[in-house]
């Protein structure tokens, strides 16, 4: 009988002994979720979902409510921290072949879509200039859907333009979606622990498992403490580091900002959207940029699960990371040469990763068989 069965018999969660710090981001995401839910609740108490009062209510929270500025900044910086953690979490999954646990991976992608929707709705709520125009640009993408587009856009707006009903429903959605995220996270964790977590070697670790507590729980607490410390340092010294200067002005439908862009964590998708000079094509590319992650469990061809011992695939992975950084950078620039060309090239390289990965896996298999 393996030590996994012994641990299960004594009611202890068995976990591989060699999982690295990259496995800590799940618990850090849970910490972020708890923090965002709590700060969001206190902000919702004082927020007013009305186009004439929303901007003033955010100013009222930061100026007049005791520790309101702390809650507002924690919630704003916490959202960025959430996305930093989730992107590292996904990158770890791609690198170590965790997508082979299909149920966990696909539930994670559903979680990512829900999180992105929540963040988008939340960005609109302060009703600043960039909030309003980002909402206008993104919701307008629905009009690209043939036949139904205009009807769907009008239905989402609650009228013929972005107005009070739009803000009210966005606030309602922003309030309810975190609870859906909590439910999906529970399902994600339960699905993970039916089979157990993978490890950096990509091997079966049933013969060498240790109890989660106190070993990994202490490890999780350390990284969560480091994360919260970084959050409070940013809050104290650079609270507006990730805010758009345009959002300090109240929304004005009569004045268009010189350069409309979403929050930094959506810039990679926005860059891919802009790189295609066609509304429907750009919208499909935007959706595909995230949905393509769901193909990885079905296109894995290598006999080895993890990239730890696959140098060629490692090179491809780091090219993907560099490409995403490049797309993010070009999305902050105006729609003009050479930025558009760089963005288009980077978008092509991004999508080619998901076609090259199975081909490279097959090539590696051939090399190993010949040796």
Curated annotation (Swiss-Prot):
One of its GO terms (biological process) is mitochondrial electron transport, ubiquinol to cytochrome c. The cytochrome bc1 complex contains 3 respiratory subunits (MT-CYB, CYC1 and UQCRFS1), 2 core proteins (UQCRC1 and UQCRC2) and probably 6 low-molecular weight proteins. This is Cytochrome b. The gene is MT-CYB. It holds the Pfam family Cytochrome_B. Heme 1 (or BL or b562) is low-potential and absorbs at about 562 nm, and heme 2 (or BH or b566) is high-potential and absorbs at about 566 nm. Belongs to the cytochrome b family. Its main location: mitochondrion. GO terms for cellular component: mitochondrial inner membrane; respiratory chain complex III. Keywords: Electron transport, Heme, Iron, Membrane, Metal-binding, Mitochondrion, Mitochondrion inner membrane, Respiratory chain, Transmembrane, Transmembrane helix, Transport, Ubiquinone. It comes from the Eukaryota. Heme b b562 binds at residues 75, 174. A ubiquinone binds at residue 193. Heme b b566 binds at residues 89, 188. Component of the ubiquinol-cytochrome c reductase complex (complex III or cytochrome b-c1 complex) that is part of the mitochondrial respiratory chain. The b-c1 complex mediates electron transfer from ubiquinol to cytochrome c. Contributes to the generation of a proton gradient across the mitochondrial membrane that is then used for ATP synthesis. It is found in: Mitochondrion inner membrane.
């Amino acid at each position: 009988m393996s030590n996994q069965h012994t641990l299960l018999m004594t009611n202890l969660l068995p976990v591989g002994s060699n999982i690295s710090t990259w496995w800590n981001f799940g618990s850090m995401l849970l910490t972020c979720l708890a923090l965002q839910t709590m700060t969001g609740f206190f902000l919702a108490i004082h927020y007013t979902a009305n186009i004439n009062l929303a901007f003033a209510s955010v100013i009222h929270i930061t100026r007049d409510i005791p520790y309101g500025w702390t809650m507002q900044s924690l919630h704003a910086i916490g959202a960025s921290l959430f996305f930093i953690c989730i992107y590292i979490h996904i990158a770890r999954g791609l690198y170590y072949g965790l997508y082979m646990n299909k149920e966990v991976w696909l539930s994670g992608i559903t979680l990512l879509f829900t999180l992105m929707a929540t963040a988008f709705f939340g960005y609109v709520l302060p009703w600043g200039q960039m909030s309003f125009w980002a909402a206008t640009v993104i919701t307008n993408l629905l009009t690209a859907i043939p036949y139904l587009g205009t009807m769907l856009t009008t239905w989402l707006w609650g009228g013929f333009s972005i107005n009070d009903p739009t803000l009210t429903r966005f606030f309602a959605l922003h309030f309810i979606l975190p609870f859906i995220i909590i439910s999906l996270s529970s399902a994600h964790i339960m699905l993970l622990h039916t089979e157990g977590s993978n490890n950096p070697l990509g091997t079966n670790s049933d013969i060498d498992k240790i109890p989660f507590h106190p070993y990994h729980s202490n490890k999780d607490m350390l990284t969560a403490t480091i994360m919260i410390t970084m959050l409070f340092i940013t809050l104290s010294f650079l609270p507006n580091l990730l805010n758009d200067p345009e959002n300090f002005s109240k929304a004005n439908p009569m004045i268009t900002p010189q350069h409309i862009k979403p929050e930094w964590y959506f810039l990679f998708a926005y860059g891919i959207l802009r790189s295609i000079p066609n509304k429907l094509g750009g919208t499909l590319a935007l959706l595909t940029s995230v949905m393509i992650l769901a193909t990885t469990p079905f296109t894995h061809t290598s006999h080895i699960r993890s990239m730890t011992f696959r140098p060629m695939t490692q090179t491809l992975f780091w090219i993907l990371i560099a490409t995403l950084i490049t797309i993010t950078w070009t999305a902050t620039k105006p729609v003009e040469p050479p930025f558009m060309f760089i963005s288009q090239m980077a978008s092509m390289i991004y999508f080619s990763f998901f076609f090259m990965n199975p081909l490279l896996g097959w090539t590696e298999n051939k090399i190993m068989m010949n040796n």
